[in-house]
Amino acid sequence: MGRALYICCGLAIFFNYLNIDWIYQGLEEYGYITGRSVVIKCISLALLVVFVKTREDYVAYALLTSLALGGNYIFNVIHARKMVGFTLVNLKIRKHIKPIVFIAGIIFMSTIYNKIDITMLSALSTDEAVGYYSYAQRTVNIVLTMCSAVTAIFLPRLSYYYDNEKAVFYKLMDKGFQILCLGVVPLAVGLFLTANQAVVLLYGDSFTPTGTTIKLMCPLILIKGFGDLLCYQLAYSSKNEYILLPGSAIASIINVITNSILIPLYAQNGAVIASVMSELTTNIIQFLYLKRKIKYHISNTALVLSLFSTMVMAAVVCAIIKMNLPLAVALAMEISIGGAIYLLMNIALKNRILSEMLTKVLKKHNTGFQDS
């Protein structure tokens, strides 16, 4: 069974050679990406229900997970033939080797940096601490995925406009920052306030310590959210990606040192503090370097409006928490009412980026209504 499990998991490595998601991201084919993901996930979910029934079915689970990943990539290759002619003739591979090796180095260092917490935690602490950390990381990653999805759509346009129209590039950077302010700040604060309730509801009373771990991880939502645009996206689009490799190396070194000191003292919470410190340090270094090299301007108005609106939202959420309602009811009210208050505050304060987004949605809705 052990060999079968390795083979099933190893299929993901094989399928990765077919990964051409970057084509669709570059062409901004997000409709196709979403549709493909929904279809594959529905099929894989149905197969999981049919073939995975007990804990002994872990090999089937691993196989279906790898096949779901491979299905995405195979769909991509088939669909890409409509846009790209694949050939093995007259390939000029040499000119691509250096940038590929460099980017691979960045990904390798980032992978080590992101995985080292769990590795050191399992070596220096208990299995319970690893479990608390894993569940906290899984919860925070849901929010981080939403943030990275927002910034990912900017990379193709930033790269194009940096080479062709600098004025539009600067406007796009400012717009991206405003959108992040609108979403990242309330998400980080909201998760911080509701962490304890969410943990009990999702994972049970036995995982109560995970609530504190999630709260300590919340700064990572701000650091990685803004850092993704102001460091990573900016570095790649402006051809300054070479700063990312030493940045990842510095983060890894800081992480190892701080983990070795803090994990024996604070277990999973020490690992979180180490991650926050290393992530903050490397993002500050990259931000200062890129800001000095690329003279872009970002308006702080959106950040001020978001902070003020988030404070009002937080006050409302705290008031609901003190009402001692049933857990599921309280959490639903905190999310819905808190979110509504935040949006209403931004509308009242005339947040420009939110007004633009609402105008586009209303215009699209009215157009669709008239067509029908």
Predicted feature locations:
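Alpha-helical transmembrane segments of multi-pass membrane transport and lipid-handling proteins
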Residues: 1, 8, 171-225, 253-264, ...
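Membrane-interface helix-capping segments at transmembrane helix termini in multi-pass transporters
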Residues: 1-14, 54-61, 201-214, 323-333
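Short runs within selected transmembrane alpha-helices of multi-pass transporters and secretion channels
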Residues: 8-25, 36-44, 61-77, 106, ...
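Interhelical loop/hinge segments that connect adjacent transmembrane helices in multipass membrane
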Residues: 58-65, 71-114, 119, 153, ...
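Alpha-helical transmembrane segments of polytopic membrane transporters and translocases
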Residues: 102, 117-119, 131-148, 176-179, ...
